[in-house]
């Protein structure tokens, strides 16, 4: 890591062309696959097929030597593709697959460098020493509790994937000016796409690439999402600007929709930047809130249904003319918040209406006033969690606990630790649920699955195993909410523990929730 920082300091005067030579440095590949150095990298390390730490240095030297050879990338991807579907030599397939993944990982590592340095310098300028709490997943839920109760409509958006990799490279070209590096990246993606297109359809090409090159695809996809979110922020600023004027409404130009059909990509951007305040129509009070998670997004508004339809129309046109993506109408659903429940970041969220009557007394007369209050509610999606547990082989599809045969070779303490970690993570993440009954069911499935796994290992029944060792064996990984609340709320508020199953707690230390499939 010191070598990399020294290289960056040395090339600070010529930042336009410092990325390409890094492809021929050994420490870049060591950095990409060394789990001990992943603290400075954004994403978690990706396991390489058949990767062996003992032979890594030899393979890296061999890879760098082959990079200098002519037509290396073509033969590399071609060998990997042929060996995948034809009878192949295992060693050749290992080396071709390893080299392909090493190059993909090194591309991702190198291209992250300018953005990581920019991020660190930004927080140093803003003097934000503890910015990790801002990354907490739970930090968005208090915001939604405060804002969604005052809004009317929500658009559930499924962000489309770009059709061709060239679009992703063009987006990246706006941020990185290293021409040789971009040419090599474009060539690698082009050959990968062409050789895979002979075997799979074009729609599945990006899907296969995302599975085999997770880190690089994630970076390119985030750049693509950032580009269209920049468009969204621009429109939002225009609407805020229009709100400050004295006029109550702005009418759109008559021929705007006819003009936009003939615009090319660059022309469309020019129109957006120069004439949006004259061509788009916004309501007097367009309160908008946008949240993105994974490949989906939510756009909530206090405006009318007509305003939401116009946002939907502009999204479709932007995707079509700027990214060349033909998006189907089912990708954006407009719903009224009071009648809609949506699956959001592991929770089933909805807006509940509470009707109550308030007695008002004026002098000798008294009368009742009906009031309606809105409350943002989050519950545990039991069906989705049971599906994840079933996919990870902890239970059946109907929720019946089963043993985990693949873990029977582990020690008892390792089995307890694995089940305990999953149970604590789920309990910690879903602490914001207003109803804990569903979470108790998930805990019961994990507890009984752990007991069945231990009983299978010792060739005994669950009842006999628990009777011999005691039921307290499984209680050490089962953290109750009362224990957590007792740490947060000391003896000054003893009454809160009585209704702890209804209390919602949002934590600021949750960066991500592990997929249960990873524990299989």
UniProtKB/Swiss-Prot annotation:
Chief localization? plastid
Extent of the signal sequence: none
InterPro entries per the record? Domain_X, Maturase_MatK, Maturase_MatK_N
- Kindly list the biological process annotations in GO that this record carries: mRNA processing; RNA splicing; tRNA processing
Q: Name one GO cellular component term.
A: chloroplast
Q: Which UniProt keywords apply?
A: Chloroplast, mRNA processing, Plastid, RNA-binding, tRNA processing
Q: Is S-adenosyl-L-methionine there in the keyword field?
A: no
Name the Gene Ontology molecular function terms of this record.
RNA binding
Q: Which compartment or compartments is the protein found in?
A: Plastid, Chloroplast
In terms of domain of life, where is this protein from?
Eukaryota
User: What does the sequence similarity comment in the record state about its family?
Assistant: Belongs to the intron maturase 2 family. MatK subfamily.
Q: What does the protein in this record do?
A: Usually encoded in the trnK tRNA gene intron. Probably assists in splicing its own and other chloroplast group II introns.
Query: What protein name does the entry list?
Result: Maturase K
Q: Which organism does this record belong to?
A: Convallaria majalis
Gene symbol here is matK
């Amino acid at each position: 890591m010191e070598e990399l920082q020294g290289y960056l300091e040395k090339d600070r005067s010529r930042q336009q062309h410092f990325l390409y030579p890094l492809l021929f440095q050994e420490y870049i590949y060591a950095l990409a696959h060394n789990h001990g150095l992943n603290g400075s990298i954004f994403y978690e390390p990706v396991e390489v097929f058949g990767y062996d730490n003992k032979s890594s240095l030899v393979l890296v030297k061999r890879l760098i030597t082959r990079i200098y050879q002519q037509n290396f990338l073509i033969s590399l991807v071609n060998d990997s593709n042929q060996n995948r579907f034809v009878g192949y030599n295992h060693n050749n397939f290992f080396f071709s697959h390893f080299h392909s993944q090493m190059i993909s990982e090194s591309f991702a590592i190198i291209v992250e460098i300018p953005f990581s340095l920019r991020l660190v310098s930004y927080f140093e300028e803003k003097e934000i020493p503890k910015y990790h709490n801002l990354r907490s997943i739970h930090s968005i839920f208090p915001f939604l509790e405060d804002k969604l109760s005052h809004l009317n409509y929500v658009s559930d958006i499924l962000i489309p994937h770009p059709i061709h990799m060239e679009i992703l490279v063009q987006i990246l070209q706006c941020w990185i000016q290293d021409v040789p590096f971009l040419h090599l990246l474009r060539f690698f993606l082009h050959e990968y796409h062409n050789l895979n297109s002979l075997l799979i359809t074009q729609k599945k090409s990006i899907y296969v690439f995302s599975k085999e090159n997770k880190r690089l695809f994630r970076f390119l996809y985030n750049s693509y999402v950032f580009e269209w979110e920049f468009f969204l922020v621009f429109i939002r600023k225009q609407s805020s600007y229009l709100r400050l004027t004295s006029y109550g409404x702005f009418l759109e130009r008559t021929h705007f929709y006819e003009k936009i059909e003939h615009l090319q990509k660059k022309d469309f951007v020019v129109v957006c930047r120069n004439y949006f305040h004259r061509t788009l129509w916004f309501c007097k009070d367009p309160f908008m809130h946008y949240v993105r998670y994974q490949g989906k997004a939510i756009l909530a508004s206090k405006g009318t249904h007509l305003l939401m339809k116009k946002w939907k129309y502009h999204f479709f046109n932007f995707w079509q003319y700027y990214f060349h993506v033909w998006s189907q109408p089912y990708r954006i659903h407009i719903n009224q918040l009071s009648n809609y429940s949506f699956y959001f970041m592991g929770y089933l969220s909805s807006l509940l209406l509470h009707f109550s009557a308030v007695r008002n007394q004026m002098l000798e007369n008294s009368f009742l006033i009906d009031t309606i209050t809105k409350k943002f509610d989050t519950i545990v999606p039991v069906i989705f969690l049971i599906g994840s547990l079933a996919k990870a082989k902890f239970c059946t599809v109907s929720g019946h606990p089963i043993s985990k045969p693949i873990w029977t070779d582990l020690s008892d303490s390792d089995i307890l630790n694995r089940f305990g970690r999953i149970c604590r993570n789920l309990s910690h993440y879903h602490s914001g649920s207003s109803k804990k009954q569903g979470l108790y069911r998930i805990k019961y499935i994990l507890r009984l699955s752990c007991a069945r796994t231990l009983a299978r290992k010792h060739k005994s029944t669950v009842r006999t195993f628990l009777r011999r060792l005691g039921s307290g064996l499984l209680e050490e990984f089962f953290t109750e909410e009362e224990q957590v609340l007792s740490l947060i709320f000391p003896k000054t508020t003893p009454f809160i523990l009585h209704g702890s199953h209804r209390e919602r707690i949002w934590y600021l230390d949750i960066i991500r929730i592990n997929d249960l499939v990873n524990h299989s």
